[in-house]
Amino acid sequence: MSKVYDWFDERLEIQAIADDISSKYVPPHVNIFYCLGGITFTCFLVQVATGFAMTFYYRPTVVEAFASVQYIMTEVNFGWLIRSIHRWSASMMVLMMILHVFRVWLTGGFKKPRELTWTTGVIMAVCTVSFGVTGYSLPWDQVGYWAVKIVTGVPDAIPVVGPTIVELLRGGVGVGQATLTRFYSLHTFVLPLLTAVFMLMHFLMIRKQGISGPL
């Protein structure tokens, strides 16, 4: 077994990477509140896993969406548990993200030279809120439908470009199948991809710059 490991280590420098990860200096002032970002990341992984599981049964059409959610909750083995974990983890992710932002702000973690780390974090915060807005509509029940109608109607107040933005979000003048398709695509592909990319950038910058010192 050691020969196999040595073969890979010679080519990929596995041990050097492992040593770098395990020997990173942690400042003495770090406490439990510095774990909030990691908890948010864990919630994101739970969201990806449970969301992926539900895509096998969910149908993104205005006719079948609600029925498919009911099927997940009542017929699929442990479907009720998977969807419940998805919902609970979503709430936890938003809460932990908010607390993480407050911790970084209060400890000055956004200051030079960590401005870009802060910027990527703000972008991920926007993505997190967008997850909530798009996911809320997917069951396509009364609450989801009217939430979409209200949210997509907000940009209409913007002068000149407002109506164009509304039509772009809805996929037409009114809320319908095109709207659900857009929100489903955003929720299951666009937003997860963007979040993963900015998370990678966020983590790499933290690894490079280290954790900010105490105030």
UniProtKB/Swiss-Prot annotation:
The keyword Ribosomal protein does not apply. One of its GO terms (cellular component) is chloroplast thylakoid membrane. Binds 2 heme b groups non-covalently with two histidine residues as axial ligands. It comes from the Eukaryota. It is found in: Plastid, Chloroplast thylakoid membrane. Coiled coil: none annotated. Pfam families: Cytochrome_B. The chain crosses the membrane at residues 32-52, 90-110, 116-136, 186-206. GO terms for molecular function: electron transporter, transferring electrons within cytochrome b6/f complex of photosystem II activity; metal ion binding; oxidoreductase activity. Keywords: Chloroplast, Electron transport, Heme, Iron, Membrane, Metal-binding, Photosynthesis, Plastid, Thylakoid, Transmembrane, Transmembrane helix, Transport. It is a multi-pass membrane protein. InterPro entries: Cyt_b/b6_N, Cyt_B6_PetB, Cytb/b6-like_sf, Cytochrome_b_N_euk/bac, Di-haem_cyt_TM. One of its GO terms (biological process) is photosynthesis. Heme b 1 binds at H100, H202. Heme 1 (or BH or b566) is high-potential and absorbs at about 566 nm, and heme 2 (or BL or b562) is low-potential and absorbs at about 562 nm. NCBIfam families: PRK03735.1. Belongs to the cytochrome b family. PetB subfamily. The 4 large subunits of the cytochrome b6-f complex are cytochrome b6, subunit IV (17 kDa polypeptide, PetD), cytochrome f and the Rieske protein, while the 4 small subunits are PetG, PetL, PetM and PetN. The complex functions as a dimer. Component of the cytochrome b6-f complex, which mediates electron transfer between photosystem II (PSII) and photosystem I (PSI), cyclic electron flow around PSI, and state transitions. This is Cytochrome b6.
